Curated annotation (Swiss-Prot):
Catalyzed chemical reaction(s): sn-glycerol 3-phosphate + NAD(+) = dihydroxyacetone phosphate + NADH + H(+); sn-glycerol 3-phosphate + NADP(+) = dihydroxyacetone phosphate + NADPH + H(+)
Active site (catalytic residues): K188 (proton acceptor)
Enzyme Commission no: 1.1.1.94
Protein's recorded name: Glycerol-3-phosphate dehydrogenase [NAD(P)+]
One term under GO cellular component: cytosol
General function of this protein: Catalyzes the reduction of the glycolytic intermediate dihydroxyacetone phosphate (DHAP) to sn-glycerol 3-phosphate (G3P), the key precursor for phospholipid synthesis.
SUPFAM superfamilies: 6-phosphogluconate dehydrogenase C-terminal domain-like (SSF48179), NAD(P)-binding Rossmann-fold domains (SSF51735)
Subcellular location: Cytoplasm
Keywords: Cytoplasm, Lipid biosynthesis, Lipid metabolism, NAD, NADP, Nucleotide-binding, Oxidoreductase, Phospholipid biosynthesis, Phospholipid metabolism
Natural source organism: Clostridium botulinum (strain Eklund 17B / Type B)
Phylogenetic placement of the source organism: Bacteria, Bacillati, Bacillota, Clostridia, Eubacteriales
Keyword Hydrolase among UniProt keywords: no
HAMAP family in alphabetical order: NAD_Glyc3P_dehydrog
Amino acid sequence: MSKVSFIGGGSFGTALAILLAEKGNTVSIYNRDKKVVDDININRRNDKYIKNLEILSNIKAFDNLEKATENTEYIVLAIPSHTIRSICKQLKSKIKQETIIISIAKGIEEHTDKRLSEVIKEELNNPIVVLSGPSHAEEVVLKLPTTLVVSSENMNSASEVQNLFMTSFFRVYTNQDLVGVEVGGAVKNIIALAAGILDGLGYGDNTKAALMTRGMKEISRIGSALGGREETFYGLTGMGDLIVTCTSNHSRNRKAGLLIGSGMGVDKAIKEIGMVVEGVKACKAFYELKEKIGVSMPITDILYKVLFEKKDPKLGIEELMLREKKSEIF
């Protein structure tokens, strides 16, 4: 059995920590919030992020990064995308070079437009594996069948992580297309936020089907331009993740959109969710990126205006509907 350290004690990180602990691994969780650490260690719960859940005895929490990662074989980065670089800088002097870094965050770095594995690689010389796909913590802890994907520049490391997580209810595939896996997971948050806005405005199934289908095209378009393979975007980390994030009541991006569509301001909606809404950051980052490289992403354009220029969402939808006539396939 292995020692696995989770950086971040949020809902999905906690769900995966329990999965690995149930397989007999020794698991540590690093969290800066002393209340979360004490709740895990003393009460065997993590009620701030996922309620009514028992934390196994072979999981220990720390508010000290060095202690949490001591002699660890795997580090799971279960933190928001904008904190990845700073945490990796802190880890550099604390971990062994052979420790495998597993990223479960979804997004790109603002201002640099770098994928998260690229950010990690700039700061650490360790093997890096990305774990992504359609998965909500609330269903993982119930052991409902879930399928994800691991990808890496080193497929031996990817296979190792595949074996680490694989169970009878948690199936993990490998995919060599690291770019496609990361981009799909990041852009779908933009479309999920838009899907929530549609729900908040009271639009129906026809509208959401159109949004998801044309949103899938935007994922494929920007992903291919960045070097990803189109077939990846129609797999688990693209279409699969898009479906679950646009339709699930567990999705914080959809829930934030729902609040915005119902008339709540963007900042207030994010505060109401209480956790990072990656779709907001992703929208800004990919809007700036697609402007640089000349990729058409009309849904992202409109969502950017709604989020950052206070455009009326209904007028935005009308603008999308009245765009120049064209063929569906282009």
